[in-house]
């Protein structure tokens, strides 16, 4: 049975999240958690939290055995961009783009 977990409006760019997501795509859940535990990136903690939520959903909703779970699908979409202006010299300004993203993880046995 497929179980989905989503984390939306993450305050990190999709590009940074995809670096971590690509390392665990298609792996068993236990192996993916080990990889995320030793990955030294902020986005690894966010992906780990969402993966643990997917595991809990599978265990609670579908009574799945967590030892057999595998990541079937994992992807990151870009979310809305918060735009800010930073004043610069001589009356100019720069745009600051605060990017967000949406993470979706699908696990199955």
Swiss-Prot record:
- Protein species of origin: Blochmanniella pennsylvanica (strain BPEN)
What's the protein called, per UniProt?
Large ribosomal subunit protein uL22
What keywords is this UniProt entry annotated with?
Answer: Ribonucleoprotein, Ribosomal protein, RNA-binding, rRNA-binding
| Keyword RNA-binding recorded | yes
- Supply the Pfam families for this chain: Ribosomal_L22 (PF00237)
Q: Return the similarity comment.
A: Belongs to the universal ribosomal protein uL22 family.
CDD domains of this UniProt entry? Ribosomal_L22
Function (record text): This protein binds specifically to 23S rRNA; its binding is stimulated by other ribosomal proteins, e.g. L4, L17, and L20. It is important during the early stages of 50S assembly. It makes multiple contacts with different domains of the 23S rRNA in the assembled 50S subunit and ribosome. The globular domain of the protein is located near the polypeptide exit tunnel on the outside of the subunit, while an extended beta-hairpin is found that lines the wall of the exit tunnel in the center of the 70S ribosome.
Subunit note: Part of the 50S ribosomal subunit.
**What Gene Ontology terms for biological process does this UniProt record contain?**
translation
Question: What domain of life does the UniProt record list for this protein's source?
Answer: Bacteria
Name one cellular component (GO) term.
Answer: cytosolic large ribosomal subunit
Q: Which GO terms describe its molecular function?
A: rRNA binding; structural constituent of ribosome
Q: Reply yes or no: does the keyword rRNA-binding apply.
A: yes
């Amino acid at each position: 049975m497929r179980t989905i977990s989503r984390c939306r409006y993450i305050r990190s760019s999709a590009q940074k999240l995809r670096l971590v997501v690509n390392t665990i795509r298609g792996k068993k859940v236990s192996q993916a958690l080990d990889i995320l535990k030793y990955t030294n990136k902020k986005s690894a903690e966010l992906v780990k939290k969402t993966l643990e939520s997917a595991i809990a959903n599978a265990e609670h909703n579908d009574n799945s055995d967590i030892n057999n779970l595998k990541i079937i699908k994992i992807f990151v979409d870009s979310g809305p961009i918060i735009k800010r202006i930073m004043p610069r010299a001589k009356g100019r300004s720069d745009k600051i783009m605060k990017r967000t993203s949406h993470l979706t993880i699908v696990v199955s046995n």
